[in-house]
């Protein structure tokens, strides 16, 4: 896969993830997440799997807890025909005004139904973030 195409797929995925969360659309949002997802680096959790993510999103969406999610500075790490790895700066604004900003490393995978889904996410600690991500 060409780098430009991988960049486009990742950007489209991020746009749809932010829009579905902003619209509190649980079905659409979770349709973008692999049943095999694994999230590391979230304080208080060793690992977040699909069921935990679903439960958290359902609670947040039903209670309209997220005002917006935005991404910027996508930095492509690697790409193949079926996987795209990148880092991106994520900003989550809560409906109560709380602000959470972090750099995350994400892996998207083209699953058997030809849909690109998130299979892995890692919240980077500051040293990792500075080494692996250049904010544009």
Residue ranges and their predicted role:
Residues 1-36, 47, 135-136:
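Short, low-complexity N-terminal intrinsically disordered segments enriched in polar/charged residues
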Residues 80-90:
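A short hydrophobic beta-strand element
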Residues 26-31, 35-75:
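A solvent-exposed, acidic/Ser-Thr-rich amphipathic alpha-helical stretch
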Residues 57, 71-76, 89-92, 103-110:
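Hydrophobic/aromatic beta-strand elements that line small-molecule binding cavities or substrate pockets
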Residues 33, 90-92, 122-124:
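Short beta-strand segments enriched in hydrophobic/aromatic residues
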Residues 63-65, 92-100:
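Short, cysteine-centered beta-strand-loop-beta hairpins and adjacent loop/turn segments enriched
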Residues 101-136:
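Short beta-strand edge/turn micro-motifs at domain boundaries
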């Amino acid at each position: 896969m060409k780098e430009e195409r991988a960049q486009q797929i990742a950007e489209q995925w991020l746009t749809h993830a932010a829009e579905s969360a902003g619209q509190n659309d649980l079905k659409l949002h979770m349709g973008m997440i692999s049943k095999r997802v694994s999230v590391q680096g979230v304080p208080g959790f060793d690992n977040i799997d699909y069921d935990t993510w679903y439960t958290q999103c359902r609670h947040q969406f039903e209670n309209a807890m997220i005002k917006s999610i935005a991404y910027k500075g996508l930095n492509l790490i690697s790409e193949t025909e079926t996987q795209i790895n990148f880092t991106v700066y994520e900003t989550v604004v809560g409906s109560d005004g709380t602000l959470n900003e972090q750099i995350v490393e994400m892996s998207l995978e083209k699953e058997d139904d030809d849909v690109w889904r998130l299979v892995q996410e890692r919240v980077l600690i500051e040293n990792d973030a500075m080494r692996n991500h250049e904010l544009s």
